[in-house]
Amino acid sequence: MIRNDIEIDTKIKCLEAKMTQQQLGEAVGTTGQYVNRIIKKKDGVVNKTFVQMMEALGYDIVLTYEKREVK
């Protein structure tokens, strides 16, 4: 089980950074529409097989986010 809601976290981080989904998409080499599909859970971020493997091994997945310092 993934204990984070990655899609919601992405939306929140966009808002905190004052970045649109279009800008985020361009920053990672994709489109704002694709970012929107991820946020709306139409396309998953995490590979389902990876999650199943970790669950079979007895693990939950917990992600942490650490803001990098701008140099």
Describe the residue ranges of each PLM region.
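Short alpha-helical "recognition helix" segments of helix-turn-helix
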Residues: 24-25
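Short glycine/serine/threonine/alanine-rich loop segments
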Residues: 19, 30, 59
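A short, Lys/Arg-rich alpha-helix, primarily the initiator
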Residues: 1-17
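Short acidic DE-rich linear segments
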Residues: 68-71
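DNA major-groove recognition helix of helix-turn-helix/homeodomain DNA-binding modules
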Residues: 48-63
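Helix-turn-helix DNA-binding elements, focusing on the entry/boundary residues of the two helices
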Residues: 10, 21, 32, 47-50
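Recognition helix of helix-turn-helix/homeodomain-like DNA-binding domains
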Residues: 29-44
